[in-house]
């Protein structure tokens, strides 16, 4: 249909892991999120998956953190 939707979520690395962050005032997460098509992003401290990048209006084609294990190698 050509219509893309977006959602607010933790952007995920391969293996269902969050992009960790440690500074709520750093531009790291906003840069990461906007480079992946989101409206904006920030470092969510002590969230559901620890300190991770949370994106606002992230396109559906970008992986997000889902329930289940983070499979680090």
UniProtKB/Swiss-Prot annotation:
Expressing tissues: Expressed by the venom gland.
Subcellular location: Secreted
One GO CC term, this protein: extracellular region
Positions of the pro-segment in this chain: 72-73
Highest taxon listed in the record's lineage: Eukaryota
GO molecular function terms noted in the UniProt entry: sodium channel inhibitor activity; toxin activity
CDD domains, sorted: neurotoxins_LC_scorpion (cd23106)
Cleavable signal peptide: 1-5
KW Oxidoreductase (keyword) present: no
InterPro entries: LCN-type_CS_alpha_beta_dom, Scorpion_toxin-like, Scorpion_toxin-like_sf, Scorpion_toxinL, Scorpion_toxinL/defensin
UniProt xrefs under Gene3D superfamilies: Knottin, scorpion toxin-like (3.30.30.10)
PROSITE patterns: LCN_CSAB
Coiled coil: none
Residues in LCN-type CS-alpha/beta domain copies: 7-71
Keywords: Disulfide bond, Ion channel impairing toxin, Neurotoxin, Secreted, Signal, Toxin, Voltage-gated sodium channel impairing toxin
UniProt GO BP: defense response
Pfam families tied to this protein: Toxin_3 (PF00537)
Cystines in this chain: 17-70, 21-43, 29-53, 33-55
Keyword Disulfide bond attributed: yes
Domain notes: Has the structural arrangement of an alpha-helix connected to antiparallel beta-sheets by disulfide bonds (CS-alpha/beta).
Family note: Belongs to the long (4 C-C) scorpion toxin superfamily. Sodium channel inhibitor family. Alpha subfamily.
Record function comment: Alpha toxins bind voltage-independently at site-3 of sodium channels (Nav) and inhibit the inactivation of the activated channels, thereby blocking neuronal transmission.
The protein, known as: Sodium channel neurotoxin MeuNaTxalpha-13
């Amino acid at each position: 249909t050509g219509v893309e939707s977006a959602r607010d979520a933790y952007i995920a690395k391969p293996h269902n892991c969050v992009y960790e962050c440690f500074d709520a005032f750093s531009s790291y997460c906003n840069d990461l999120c906007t480079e992946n098509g989101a409206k904006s992003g920030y470092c969510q401290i002590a969230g559901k998956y620890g300190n991770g990048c949370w994106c606002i209006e992230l396109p559906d084609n970008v992986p997000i953190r889902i329930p289940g294990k983070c499979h680090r190698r």
